[in-house]
Design a protein with these regions (language model features):
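A short C-terminal boundary segment appended to hydrolase-like catalytic domains
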Residues: 233-270
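N-terminal active-site segment of His-dependent metallophosphoesterases
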Residues: 1-59, 77-80, 97, 132, ...
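Active-site neighborhood of phospho(di)ester-bond hydrolases with catalytic His/Asp-centered motifs
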Residues: 6-8, 35-40, 64-71, 113, ...
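Beta-strand-turn-beta hairpins that frame and shape the catalytic cleft
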Residues: 1-5, 100-111, 138-145, 205-209, ...
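Conserved beta-sheet core of the metallophosphoesterase superfamily
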Residues: 162-238
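Extended active-site neighborhood of metal-dependent phosphoesterases/phosphodiesterases
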Residues: 51-132, 140, 174-175, 204
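Short acidic, glycine-rich surface-loop motifs adjacent to enzyme active sites
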Residues: 142-159
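Active-site environment of divalent metal-dependent phosphoester hydrolases
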Residues: 13-15, 43-47, 71-82, 117-121, ...
Length: 270
C-alpha cells in the first residue's frame, strides 16, 4: 500500500508548537510516500511565515511533496505586491510551479491553483484549468489512482458554507468525473469530511469522491472540528478498487493525533 498525507490550512503565523510536534510524530509513525499541502500555508503570506512553513514540511521527511497556494498565500495589505507579484513569496519557499503534477506508477495527481489576486477569499476554476486537468487524467492508466487537488471545496455539507464553494465547481466536477478522476481533495473551510459526489451531483455517471481536510496545525480551528489531517492509503495497483481515507484528529489531552474516522473509497474503472 502507498500512503498520501494531506495537510491543509496550516496558516503559519498562527501555528501551534504542540500540534506541530504531534504531526511530526504521526508522519514518522506512518511514513507516507507523498505529502499534499492543499493551500493556506500561511496567515499573511510573509517571507518569514513561508520559510517556517517550508522548514516544517521538510521536517516531516516525506519523499515527494506537492503544494499549491490558498487565498491566504497572496499578500492582503500590500496591494502592489498583490497585483504585480502575488506569488513571489510562495514561489521562493515552495518552488516556481503553481500547479505541479505528480505522476507515479500508482498515482496520477493534478493540482489547480484556484486563487485569484482580485478575490479576497473565494476561489475559481477556469475552463482552461478544467481542460488541462482533463488532459492529464486522459493519460492516466487503470493502475493509477487519479487525484485532483484544489483549495476551495467543490462540495459543502452546510448551507452556511455555500459561499465558500469553488466558483465553477459544477462544470469542473462533471468534466473531471467524465475524464476519470477518482478523488478531489480540498481544504479552506477547516472542516474535514468525505462524501461521494455522485450522490449529490445529479446526472454524474461515474463515482467521484470529495475529500476535505481540516486545519493541520493552526489555532484557527472550528468549535466542532479540532486540528486534523487526512491519510489516504491506496494500493500499488489501483485495479484493486479500494482505497481508505483516515482522518486523524489532534487530541490535546494526549498531545497526539489519533484516528478519528475511516472511509473506504470504492474506485470505479469503466
Amino acid at each position: 500500500m502507498r500512503k498520501l498525507l494531506q495537510i491543509s490550512d496550516m496558516h503559519f503565523g498562527t501555528e501551534q508548537l504542540d500540534v506541530m510536534a504531534a504531526l511530526l510524530a504521526l508522519s514518522q509513525e506512518n511514513k507516507p510516500d507523498v505529502l499534499v499541502v492543499s493551500g493556506d500555508i500561511t496567515q499573511r503570506a510573509t517571507a518569514e511565515q513561508f520559510s517556517r512553513a517550508r522548514a516544517f514540511c521538510d521536517s516531516l521527511r516525506v519523499a515527494q511533496m506537492i503544494s499549491l497556494p490558498g487565498n491566504h498565500d497572496i499578500p492582503l495589505f500590500n496591494l502592489f505586491s498583490r497585483v504585480m507579484s502575488p506569488y513571489a513569496a510562495y514561489q521562493k519557499a515552495f518552488g516556481h510551479a503553481l500547479e505541479p503534477d505528480l505522476i507515479t506508477p500508482s498515482l496520477c495527481l493534478a493540482t489547480v491553483n484556484t486563487t485569484r489576486w482580485w478575490r479576497h477569499k473565494n476561489g475559481e476554476v477556469s475552463k482552461a484549468q478544467i481542460d488541462r486537468v482533463c488532459e492529464q487524467l486522459s493519460r492516466a492508466t487503470s493502475q493509477q489512482l487519479r487525484v485532483v487537488v484544489v483549495h476551495q471545496p467543490v462540495h459543502v455539507l452546510r448551507p452556511q458554507d455555500e459561499h465558500d464553494r469553488l466558483r465553477g465547481w459544477e462544470p469542473a466536477v462533471r468534466a473531471w468525473a467524465a475524464a476519470g478522476a477518482d478523488v478531489v481533495m480540498g481544504g479552506h473551510i477547516h472542516l474535514p469530511y468525505v462524501c461521494e459526489l455522485s450522490d449529490t451531483v445529479s446526472g454524474l455517471k461515474r463515482r467521484l469522491w470529495c475529500v476535505q481536510a481540516g486545519t493541520a496545525v493552526s489555532s484557527r480551528i472550528r468549535r466542532e472540528a479540532p486540528n486534523s489531517v487526512n491519510l489516504l492509503e491506496f494500493p500499488d495497483d489501483a485495479n484493486n478498487l479500494r482505497c481508505c481515507v483516515e482522518r486523524w484528529d489532534y487530541q490535546k489531552a494526549g498531545g497526539r493525533f489519533e484516528l478519528a474516522d475511516s472511509s473506504v473509497l470504492n474506485v470505479q474503472r469503466i
